Amino acid sequence: MSEHEQAHSQLDSVEEAIADIAAGKAVVVVDDEDRENEGDIIFAAELATPELVAFMVRYSSGYICAPLTAKDADRLDLPPMTAHNQDARGTAYTVTVDANTGTTGISATDRAHTLRLLADPEADRTDFTRPGHVVPLRAREGGVLVRAGHTEAAVDLARAAGLRPAGVICEVVSEEDPTGMARVPELRRFCDEHDLKLISIEQLIEWRRKNEILVERQVETVLPTDFGTFKAVGYRSIIDGTELVAIVAGDVASDGGENVLVRVHSECLTGDVFGSRRCDCGQQLHESLRLIQEAGRGVVVYMRGHEGRGIGLLAKLRAYQLQDEGADTVDANLALGLPADAREFGTSAQILYDLGVRSLNLISNNPAKKVGLEGHGISIASRTPIPVAVHEDNVRYLKTKRDRMGHDLPDVALWEQEHPEN
């Protein structure tokens, strides 16, 4: 049995966790081992009690956060904690708050009151003081199907339990090693000791994927290209209306949808359309289409809305300005107050699943993309790297992708050997 299977065998069912949330109990939710690999105590903000808060503080870091929908965060006038969010996971912290009635705000009783108030649909901004001792978080619309984080998991669980979409989360600290965080084996023992259910975000994603659809297939047509004839399948996101397209060769649902050659390609107007030499996006798109046509079976999912690794076209051009002044592609984004990579792959996973794909040979130089897709119910059988043409216009960008973002780019090392002066 693999480590992944062993960990999964120690988990309870999503249905059991939802039932406990509805009953006012806490559960523990663990995320992907390649993400934070941490377990959070989670319960519904609407049903917060001093006892639940005291338990959370006793066994966690004590940094209690309250995930809310973006709509509720706006209604309560909860702006971002900082204009320049540099959190590695893109966690959307807002200003901290306390209920405006109570004592110091730090006690379990006061924090439970603040949490219930955050979940109250009748509450408004005047019911809170700022700063405080509870940290609201803004959850992504679409929940764990869009972002596989504890923030979204808490909101999804509360909603699935028939409660207000507001949760309470805090990371479980290891009792066996108080300097670190608890991992799955210890979390299982912790949950057994305290009669708590333990589930994973991966399970919750799978549960939601089976029960909900966030993309709709709209149209299907033949698409002749310079690389051969494909089928173009158009989709629309139910969340924000973004129009997406899958370029399909052959019968990808045959053989159980196993080991399908797939490229999940992030939109890049400058590289894909204008042939920009600052990036390798156009090269990767064209090579992927060629490989798939050659194989006779595969998919390119073209992810609109991923421009500039998710920051948008104009922001990407502003980042280019900063790169012209010496910043690399990561620092340029951060200097603009934007994440180095804001992309999420839940929508692409749903498109692949709708097409009948169950496991895939991923065409990518980015190992992190594997984690993003696997966390959304798609299994990665293998990964096919794409050779890139390295030249003076893109070498700095490619070096940053290799050195700071973990991309697999052996062609860069070859270029460095041939150009030691650079």
Curated annotation (Swiss-Prot):
Binding of Mg(2+) 1 occurs at 36
Where are the stretches annotated DHBP synthase?
1-210
Swiss-Prot/TrEMBL cofactor(s): Mg(2+); Mn(2+); Zn(2+)
Where, in this chain's numbering, is Zn(2+) bound? 268, 279, 281
Q: Record's superkingdom?
A: Bacteria
Q: Where is this region: GTP cyclohydrolase II?
A: 211-422
Q: Which family does it belong to?
A: In the N-terminal section; belongs to the DHBP synthase family. In the C-terminal section; belongs to the GTP cyclohydrolase II family.
Query: What this chain does, per the record?
Result: Catalyzes the conversion of D-ribulose 5-phosphate to formate and 3,4-dihydroxy-2-butanone 4-phosphate. Catalyzes the conversion of GTP to 2,5-diamino-6-ribosylamino-4(3H)-pyrimidinone 5'-phosphate (DARP), formate and pyrophosphate.
What this protein is called in its record is: Riboflavin biosynthesis protein RibBA
